[in-house]
Every structure is written in structure tokens, then in C-alpha cells.
Amino acid sequence: MSRKRNHCYMETGASSESQGAFVDSAGPFSRDEEDFSELEPDEQLVCSVTEITEHLGRNITVVLESALSEIRKLVGVRIRVLKMELREKSDEIELLKAKLESAEKDGRVSNFSSLDFRKSEHQKYGAEPKKAKTGTPVVKKENINAICDYLMKDKNQRGAAEVESDHSNQAFGSERDVRTEAQPHGSLSLWPDSGPADTDAETDIFSMLPSASKRMYDYEWMTGVELNSAEFKGDSETKCEDVPPMDEEDENEDSEEGRGSLRSVSDHFPLDTQGSPGEDRSSPAEDSMDRMEPGQQFTSHTFICPFCGTLCPDSSFLEEHIKLMHHGESLLQSTSAGSSSQAEGDSGEAGPASRGAREKKVEGGYECGDCGRHFNYLGNLRQHQRIHTGEKPFVCPECGERFRHTARLKSHRLSHSGAQSPFPCPQCGKGFPVLSGLKRHQRVHTGESPYACPQCGRRFKELGNLYTHMRIHSGATPYTCYQCGRSFRHLGTYKSHRCMPATQMPSEHSPPWAQEDKVQTGRLQGYV
């Protein structure tokens, strides 16, 4: 019995030992599985971060490429515009260089003739001829005002007797002899490099020219005129106005370069002279006009290009400038010259007297006599007055449609030819005849509203819309029906209102501009 018990005890002990060994061997395996399960989420997180990084990198690359392409388009459009402007300026510079060379040649010839004349004069009276340099005197740019002052004095003295001019020439000759003996090696330059000389040296450069030199008088348009004054800036650049237009069309038209209707040198090119009647211009030349004697005359004129406002010394220079720079525009103007002159004759308002009555000179600019609108420059006022007179001098040769401004005609003719507008929108491709129109249109894409109402704070993209809105606060009703006497706040309401057929309108109550835009700005109500 004891043997059996010992045998069973040994079997049970062995089995328990084997079970313990199995449990010990299974323990490390379960711990490895737990560690592996803990590592799997970390690896998945690393993979997801890598995928997100790659996706973001691809998106950023696509966005950068699209942005670069848009920037290239914008820069390309701007470069093309600048190249066109540079090409036009280069052509004009070449023309001016040719004119300058011819002027220098004429100046040298006149210098030689004056020197020969004085040499013969000295030999006649037994005087020893002096030596003079044959080069053209050099005048610094910063001293051009002194030359203008001298030319003004010479112009005021031009009407004196010939005997007095002969005596003055002899006096200048004797003074030159004295100065050349005192300074035998002096330069004929008006101002040396060391600084400006005394006032006696100013007469040296001009005493070399004869008193009747044609080239000097051809360029008298420079005398006593401040070229940086507001008057001449208005003819070349009119980008903004103190008083805004009432509708988008007028705002686009006023933003063009100043091309007011000007006096003509020929039948086809209207020009404006500095001393034209009906104008109230103020310039430094008026002071010299007050000091002139009754027997003298002020004969200098300023010839202005009607298309770009360039100042020209004479009519021939202006005609060449128009042929070279504005050949197409001059043909269009000549096409519409007969019809516009007939319209002016029928209306009876194109005369100097009526124009002077409608052009009021006020402090700081000009005022329209019809609606009271204020302008900085006379050219812009005359463009605006086409609204009141109904004048549309520019005619399309293809369809016969008429326009108030040449820029509108250019844009219209592009529709016939199928060509691209000079200023296309880079976002939507819409074309505009002037750069200011493109800038206003781009506010639609950018969402910019720069004009705010001072009373309610509402903002507008267009200045004309702001002034139309301000009529709500002021109660202004500038559009009046000439049959029933009703007044309207908006032009569209006025045009849609018809209390009597247009054929029954009495002529004495409907002026020619009543069917057009009877624009009366907020200035009449005290808001300008």
C-alpha cells in the first residue's frame, strides 16, 4: 500500500511540475503579444502623419504654381502696356531730336551771320575785330527761367523804334568789346560750371543773334510761362477732378487725357491759343501785358495738340506731330469736321461770346455756366459742355454712330475690327479704352468700396453712385420735366417719365440738351 501511495505521489508531483513549466513558458509569449499590440497604433500614427504631410505638400505645390501663373499673366499684361507706351515715347523723342538738330543748325547759321555782320561793322569804323568761339553757348537746365525772363524783356521792347534798337545793338557791341579785353580767355557759356555769372553775361548769348531772328520768335511760346503750372498740366494729364461726375459714362470720359475742343490751325485740327478770346486764363505773361505800351503788340501763341495736349512752338510743328502720333485720330476728326461745324452753326452756341458766358473763371478753376459743376482745367470743362450742347463730334466711319470723346470711338471701332481692347481685365478679359476704366472695373473683383457716405456710412465702388445716393439726404431733384414741372432724383426715372409725346414738346421749353443728360451735380445743393 505504501508503494502505491508513493507512486501516485510521484506521478502527481511530476504532473504539477510539468504544468508549472508550461505556465512559465506561456507567460513570456503573452507579454510579447501585448508589447506588439501596443506598437501597432504608433506605427499607424506615423504612417498617417506621413500621408498628410505628402498631401499638404502636393496641395501647396499646386497653389503656388497657380499663383505664379496668375502673377505671370498680370506682369505680362503690364509689360505689354509699358512696351507700347515706351515705343510711342521713343518715336516722339526721335522726332524731337530731329527738330532739335535742325534748330541747332539754324542757330549756328544765325551766329555766323551775326559775327560776320559785326566784323564788317568793326572794319568800317576802324575797330579791331574780336575773336569769338564758333560753338553754340551751353545753358544749364536749372537756369532756363533766367532765359525766359530775358526773352520776356526782349519781347516787351520789340515794338520800339528801329533807331533805338540799332543804338542798343551798338551799345551791346561796345560792352562786349570791353568785356573781351578784360577777359580774353572767357567762355561764351552763359553760366560757367563754377556757378551762375552776373547779369551782364545774360546779354552775351542773345546779343550774338540778330534782333529779327526767326527761330527765337518761333519759340516765344516758352517766354514767361511756368510749364509746371496747373493750366498746362490740365492739357496733358487730367486724371481726377475735384467734383465727381454723376454717372459712370461721364466719369470714364472725364478720366481721359485732356482733349478740350480747341481753336483750329487748319480746318480739321482744332487748336487753342494762349490769347484766344472768351478765355479767362491767368499766367505770368499777363503781368507783362499790363506793362506794354499802346503801340506794342503781343504776338506769341501757344499751339496745343487737341489729342494729347502736347505744347508745340508753331503750327507746322503741330501738324507734323499730329501726322506722326495721331494719324488715325486726325482722319476720324476730319471725317466728322463738316457735320460738327454744321451742328455748331445750327445751335448758335459755339461762338466765343456764348462760350465765354458758359465758362466762368472762379477761384481754383472753372465753373460750368449751365449746371455749376466745378473743374480744375478748361479743357475738361469744354469736354463736359458737350453734354449740355449735345455735341458729338466723333463719328464712326463704319456705322455712323457718334460719340462725345475719341476714346469712346476707339473702343467702339474695336468691335468692328474684332481687335483686343488696349486695357483688358486680367481676371475676366473685359476690355476698356482707358486705364482708369480698367481700374474702376477691378473693384468688382477685389470688392473694394472706397467711397463712403458722410451721413449714413454706406460705401460705394463708384464716386458717381455716391453722389447720386447723397440726393436722398439732401432731397435734391435735379432732373425737371419741362412739360409738367415734376422733378426727379434719378436720370433713369426722368427719361422713363413721359407726360406728353416727344413730338408735341414745345420748342421754346425744350433746349437741345434736355433730351440728353441734364446733369446738375450735388454742388447746386451744397454737397460738393
Swiss-Prot record:
GO terms for biological process: central nervous system myelination; positive regulation of myelination; positive regulation of oligodendrocyte differentiation; regulation of transcription by RNA polymerase II. Residues 79-106 form a coiled coil. Changing C428F: In st78; gross morphology is normal. Expression of myelin basic protein (mbp) in the central nervous system (CNS) is strongly reduced, whereas mbp expression in the peripheral nervous system is unaffected. InterPro entries: C2H2-ZF_Transcription_Reg, Znf_C2H2_sf, Znf_C2H2_type. GO terms for molecular function: DNA-binding transcription factor activity, RNA polymerase II-specific; RNA polymerase II transcription regulatory region sequence-specific DNA binding; zinc ion binding. Disruption phenotype: Gross morphology is normal. Expression of myelin basic protein (mbp) in the central nervous system at 5 dpf is strongly reduced. Expression of mpb in the peripheral nervous system is normal. Pfam families: zf-C2H2. Residues 232-242, 257-270, 278-293 have a biased composition (Basic and acidic residues). It comes from the Eukaryota. Its main location: nucleus. A zinc finger (C2H2-type) spans 303-326, 366-388, 394-416, 423-445, 451-473, 479-501. It is found in: Nucleus. Keywords: Coiled coil, Metal-binding, Neurogenesis, Nucleus, Repeat, Transcription, Transcription regulation, Zinc, Zinc-finger. Residues 333-345 have a biased composition (Low complexity). Probable transcription factor. Important for development and migration of oligodendrocyte precursor cells, and normal myelination of axons in the central nervous system (CNS). Functions autonomously in oligodendrocytes to promote CNS myelination. Seems to act in parallel with notch3 during oligodendrocyte development. Belongs to the krueppel C2H2-type zinc-finger protein family. This is Zinc finger protein 16-like. It comes from Danio rerio.
